[in-house]
Amino acid sequence: MDEAIQIVNAIKKGQISPIYFLYGEEAYFIDKISDYIAAKVLTEEEKGFNQMVLYGRDVTIEDIIGNAKRYPMMAERQVVIVKEAQHLSRTIENLCSYADNPQMSTVLVICYKYKKLDKRKKLHKIVKKNGVIFESKKLYENQVSDWLRKHLLSRGYSISHKAANLLVEYLGTDLSKISKELEKLKLALPQQTEITPEHIEEHIGISKDYNNF
């Protein structure tokens, strides 16, 4: 969680790496980092010729390397985002040759969800040396409640302990699912509101008396 914030903050400061390998069980942080790169690294004018999204089920590692080696057009950088890269798990180590000598004018983002990358293998070591490698781990229930409070606080809301527990009990630890439900609350309630079980029942439809036992 904190590491994801550090990665985004570094990008905000202009500290942009040539390769980001984002992997792990929690899709939420992978999406947040890749979406931030997609939104902020290039200007809207630059994106037309210099930003592309590839899907792991449709491409090979060689396709990815070929696109990453292109030069940007009328821009300092190009951005290549590979979504669903977990479909390339059998050949992912073939990325080593590129990761060892990445194109510095390319920002290559690999979104490798729901999979582990073996830390003992060459690719993990090379990306760690030349770029950013981030493991997005599932949060435990007690960590999700803490994340929920911080997430809302950063957006001008607070939440009662009972309401936070209600959301986690009902929705589990899937941060993407929780985030979507929080959007409903943010649309319905003004900032500075403390979210209560009654708000959750009214706007999300989870009974304030819900108990999964």
Describe the predicted segments one by one.
Residues 1-213:
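Conserved beta/loop motifs at nucleotide-recognition and modification sites
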